[in-house]
Amino acid sequence: MPVPVLVVGGGSVGLLTAALLTHHGVPAVLVERRSGPSVHPRATGIGPRTVEILRELGLETAVDALAVDLRGAAGKAVARTVVEMGAGDVVTVPMPAPSTDELDVTPFRLRGVCAQDRLDAVVAADLARRGADLRWSTRLVGLAQDADGVDVELEGPDGRYSLRCTRVVAADGTHSTARTALGVGTSGPGDLGKSMINILFRADLRPHLRGMSFATCTITTPEAPGLLATVDGETDWVFHVRCDVDGGERPEDFTHERCAAVVRLAVGDPDLDVEVRSVLSWRPRSAAAESFAVGRVFLVGDAAHTVSPLGAFGLNTGVADAHNLAWKLAAVHHGGAGAGLLDTYAHEREPVAAATLDQAMRRLADPQLHWGRGPEADAARAAAGVWAAPVVHLGQRYDSAAVVDPRPELPSTVDLVLDGSPGSRVPHAWIDGVSTLDLVASRWTLLAGVAGERWLTAAANVGLSAHRVAVPWLPDEGALLVRPDGIVAMRATASATDPARFLTEVLDQVLARPVPVANA
């Protein structure tokens, strides 16, 4: 029997794709060329939508336990060295606390930053507990698809072998083997700036910091300029430095010994005990695949789009890809939807990725637009076409056949507005102590207004979970039909003549039904 879904790549997005498929009851195989989850964090900013998705999987608490509490800390610091920072010679931008408005939008947040390796360890361990088929030290060699499935060639510890799959999700990174095999090109600015060296190291900086904490610190000493990022805020850190390729440097010149010396210069302590754990070379990049789906193969994460780092949009955009795709693959796999539903993945995610790439590039052009606070900064962002970060993370909308009467226009790029419009994430509200986000998680759900008894009866007749809610964004006799990914599929402002028939017709449209007998 073919494997229902093969996930290629075991980074954060690949692992969460496998986790979401497992959550929806779809058997999946994950292959990853490394011997296990990466120990080297490439990101630390887990956004609010990703936290909501982790909560849906039951992993929010475990990830939050590994996050570094930065409440009251500096979001960004600038100092010549760590020693001078601890002595008070530092410029800081405070870590913004969630406003009341933001908490009204999403009550679920991590206490601070959580390095990507910690996230990956939690997800991989959960998959292993669930008996998922995780094949480490295994790489994709090639693939070919036909009308009924995909044949992939893999290379693992025991050599090469073939695998027949119904569908493939490629989460294999910026230089995706799957994307190349499909012949899909990329567009966008491409490589940005200089090559970088990412040094993961362990050293106890607490005596030098003297109680100072931060998410990132720009180190300005001429001997070792770079960006120091918190992993645990005590002994684990990442330091980004430039590789002067124009001056003759090569990434392989950055041995562990040299990297330890660079860290000591940045800290300002020549006798610092440093353990270099890992060294990665990378280059900022901004590009998107020309298509996110080809036949039975779907691109997610960096395989679909590589986002420049300022804004912490890259990882979170990839997780949103996985969340959008997983329930659709599950619906088709279980026979509840036609294969046409899968076409809406690219239709929905490609515009979101394009907008996110644009927003990251605007921040890169003037980083102060990202870090600035207050009315003047808001005005500067508006003038530069820079959206507020919560709008990028939570406010973007879908326009596809999987949404009835979509409203893709953003009400505001300054304030996050979630009003129940079709194509937007369902608004959060507390209903008897339970968030609407929890009420709708992972399943089709009808939310009916306070006078929506006919909607509730109809929902029961067609097999939908349903709840009565008293909220300002839903008329008393109205209803919202919410998809398993928390997106509003339909909004009715009043009762229908035949609510059950109406709901059935909406579901038929969104799910590309009726499903042909031969559908797979």
Which residues does each PLM region occupy?
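C-terminal helical "tail/cap" subdomain of flavin- and related membrane-associated enzymes
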Residues: 330-444, 449-457, 461, 490-494, ...
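Glycine-rich Rossmann-fold phosphate-binding loop(s) that bind the pyrophosphate
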Residues: 9-11, 33, 116
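Core beta-strand elements of the Rossmann-like FAD/NAD(P) dinucleotide-binding domain
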Residues: 158-167
